[in-house]
């Protein structure tokens, strides 16, 4: 039996008719009875939609009260983002490797259920709002331990390579990430080519971004590493992980994950655009780089190339600027009218200033330590 009596719902498509999803979930869980207590659209997620489902399940594989999240596509998406089926596989691989992520439960490819693919994962406790996190009263005491934990989590993630096989129940070893594209040469040169193509597709002139890409290309011998790629989140930053009592409970939003140089994730996490005004704490505005580096190197058994991180920070500013322009284009084209998306384009000058300042610091030889 399925019931939605008493559900706390808003006026949105899923909340207006959750019956097909609940029927599908009852089949997946083998439940005798599944009652929806609450449906709530979660904030954030400019590229995907996330819905909190509070369920009471009787019988089957998940008997009892459950808090799950349904994740599906927004009205339009950034072209380079992974599909929901691919993101589910990525989340499953990370979970099996012991990365701190929500447990992925079920994937639905039947468009008759919701109109588009979606997956279900466990809801995790914690706060993700970046500006609240970087201004937390407990940050001075908890920041060092928190960024050390982030270093351990990232090292665990980067232990996944294209050769990694995952042990799954009843299936033996399985290669879950077969779908991820591989690149020739270095991740750095591959990223430059991707950003150039993205700018060309926008059809508007952005000379600062073009200059910065040229500068990165001119300096490839310094920061490009053709070493074996690792699985990188590629959006590992404050705002994409949940924090509860000073500890990370889950790394979220895997739509950009793929093979890359592990320094890309570190440059992204430490980029100025993701410090949210907390400039003196380079690791996402939360803590020092030295604490992060010590934990990462201890957990991974690999030393970091700190010089390369500066160049990856420039790339991070470029990439976020391109994504912001793409998001603004989604609004401007009429695909998805949203004030948040429209305002994204106005963030680009700040990123351009960040990349120019960083290039200047590197060229003058005064960029040497992220904590300085």
Predicted feature residues:
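Conserved protein kinase catalytic-loop anchor
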Residues: 229-231, 249
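Catalytic-loop of the protein kinase fold
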Residues: 231-233, 238
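Activation of the activation-loop gatekeeper triad in protein kinase-fold domains
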Residues: 252-257
